[in-house]
């Protein structure tokens, strides 16, 4: 399964854990995509103003910036950017709903296999591409229950 109709997609990962960020970058690059990681959420605005990406993957719990606030900020900056939460919080219904209200398009627990995240990325990207073609919006994609 490919996250878009093209051969590759451009991803931005925002996670304060350098090990997780590196793992995701490596995984997505092995799948043929371009990928950049930020381990400091405060870098997001300047990065997005200078670069393009098709999907952002955001951690909820970071020491310097709250993931929910970051999602809201990103949504204001780019209303059409697909945002997927990838969090170690697990399936926390309150956090999930807060992320979705802030503008996230999907929610995945870090406790699930990486292939699950990839499937959610593919579905979110496909849904967002359909929206751009004026297809009625679909529900957010959730994969937090283990």
Predicted feature descriptions by range:
Residues 59:
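Active-site residues of response regulator receiver
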Residues 46, 68-80:
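Short amphipathic alpha-helix used as the core "switch/output" element in two-component signaling
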Residues 69, 90-106:
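Alpha4 helix (beta4-alpha4-beta5 surface) of REC/receiver domains from two-component response regulators
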Residues 37-55:
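Acidic, metal-coordinating helix/loop segments flanking the phosphotransfer/catalytic sites
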Residues 39-40, 66-69:
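Acidic catalytic/metal-coordinating carboxylates
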Residues 94-95, 112-122:
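C-terminal output helix
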Residues 86-87:
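Hydrophobic/aromatic residues positioned on beta-strands within the core alpha/beta folds
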Residues 21, 63:
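The feature encodes the CheY-like receiver
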């Amino acid at each position: 399964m490919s996250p878009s109709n093209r051969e590759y997609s451009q991803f931005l990962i925002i996670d304060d854990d350098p090990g997780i960020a590196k793992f995701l970058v490596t995984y997505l690059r092995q799948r043929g995509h371009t990928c950049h990681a930020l381990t400091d959420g405060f870098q997001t605005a300047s990065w997005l103003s200078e670069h393009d990406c098709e999907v952002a993957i955001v951690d909820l719990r970071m020491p310097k910036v709250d993931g929910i606030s970051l999602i809201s900020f990103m949504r204001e900056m780019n209303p059409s950017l697909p945002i997927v939460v990838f969090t170690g919080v697990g399936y926390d219904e309150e956090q999930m709903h807060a992320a979705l209200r802030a503008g996230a398009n999907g929610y995945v627990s870090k406790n699930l296999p990486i292939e699950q995240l990839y499937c959610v990325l593919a579905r979110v990207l496909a849904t967002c591409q359909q929206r751009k073609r004026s297809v009625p919006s679909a529900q957010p994609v959730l994969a937090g229950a283990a």
